[in-house]
Amino acid sequence: MRIEQLREHLRALGARPGHEQSVLRHWACALPQQRRSAREDVLPLALREALPALEAELQGLARLRSEHSAEDGSARLLVALADGQTVESVLLPRDGLCVSTQVGCAVGCVFCMTGQGGLLRQLGSAEIVAQVALARGHRAVKKVVFMGMGEPAHNLDNVLEAIELLGTAGGIGHKNLVFSTVGDERVFERLPQGAVKPALALSLHTTKPELRAQLLPRAPRIAPEDLVAHGERYARATGYPVQYQWTLIDGVNDGDDELDGIVRLLAGRYAVMNLIPYNTVDGLAFQRPAWERAVAMAGALHRRGVLTKLRRSAGQDVEGGCGQLRARALGGARWIKIEPVSGTGAHHVDQF
């Protein structure tokens, strides 16, 4: 379901714009539709009579199948959709929520569990917001990051529609809505045009174009320099820095040569580098580097003029890597290995 379809249904029941916003606010904020102030209790009769069935339908868009709490205060939610498919959401410490935008993913990042199964279907904008409503039934949600299963750029209309609602009726500050992408020209065209302009996170992972093409095999072929240039323009236009995501993988992208590349790209930019040690996935032949190495990299980048945050992967003890919980429920995994090609400085990907 798309939010626009929901709006059309409300209008057919006699809702005026204020009525629409009231119903959508109650839904997105997980407030019972039947509990309204006297001022709000002026909905048209047909709409009031339809509310119980409507509320049940909206709740059915995303239902909790299982919850797995972690020691760091995060909790991974396996969410069942109305058609029986499942996606993952993650309740993050400090009132954050990570939501999914697709069932599966077409980018095929070789270190990501979600990417191994390909794309099954898009989520409708209402299904995306429904994850927020479901989470708000558990705890407060003041920040939403679109970093769960799926590539938001590949479901752009639905994601932007969800962002518009969350940034208005949903009561979430625009900079606390974080659109995460591997990079796509359509994103850089569309985001500046929206009434709600989210913060932007770009999945960089390496400064080497050839290695990035292997790690993210079906991502658009945008050179790291061009990706950063796009990000810088958006950051200056919105007034909040771009977050660059870097999944630290032992022996793959944690070398001193990558440090030099990051400094070349990001020193002096309106940017934050997020170093995220790899969240180990059963069946994938990647490992996180030693914590001491991650700390050393963050410190070196700070000293060389790149604002850097070293993040512990949320939910490491509850299968916190993207797609792990769903894969565990479905069963199956595929081994992937990246090895240096002797004498070339490049890397070779083996899948078996």
Curated annotation (Swiss-Prot):
For this protein, what is any one GO molecular function term?
4 iron, 4 sulfur cluster binding
Keyword Zinc-finger annotated: no
Q: What class of enzyme is it?
A: transferase
Q: Which PROSITE patterns is this protein grouped with? A: RADICAL_SAM
Subcellular localization, as worded in the UniProt entry: Cytoplasm
**Binding positions for [4Fe-4S] cluster?**
C105, C109, C112
Q: Which cysteines are joined by disulfide bonds?
A: C98-C322
Which Gene Ontology BP terms does the record give? rRNA base methylation; tRNA methylation
Q: Which cofactor does it need?
A: [4Fe-4S] cluster
Q: Secretion signal: which residues?
A: none
Q: Which organism is it from?
A: Methylibium petroleiphilum (strain ATCC BAA-1232 / LMG 22953 / PM1)
* This protein's UniProt keywords: 4Fe-4S, Cytoplasm, Disulfide bond, Iron, Iron-sulfur, Metal-binding, Methyltransferase, S-adenosyl-L-methionine, Transferase
Free-text remark on how the cofactor is bound: Binds 1 [4Fe-4S] cluster. The cluster is coordinated with 3 cysteines and an exchangeable S-adenosyl-L-methionine.
User: Matching SUPFAM superfamilies, A to Z?
Assistant: Radical SAM enzymes
Q: Which residues form the Radical SAM core domain?
A: 91-317
Q: Which Pfam family name is an example for this entry?
A: Radical_SAM
Against NCBIfam families, the record matches this protein to:
PRK14464.1 (NF011034)
- The name under which this protein is listed is Probable RNA methyltransferase Mpe_A3613
Which Enzyme Commission numbers does its entry carry? Answer: 2.1.1.-
Where, by residue number, does S-adenosyl-L-methionine bind?
G150, E151, S180, S203, L204, H205, N279
Q: Where is the active site?
A: E88, C322
Q: Which InterPro entries match?
A: Aldolase_TIM, Methyltransferase_A, rRNA_lsu_MTrfase_RlmN/Cfr, rSAM
Q: Which family does the record claim for this protein?
A: Belongs to the radical SAM superfamily. RlmN family.
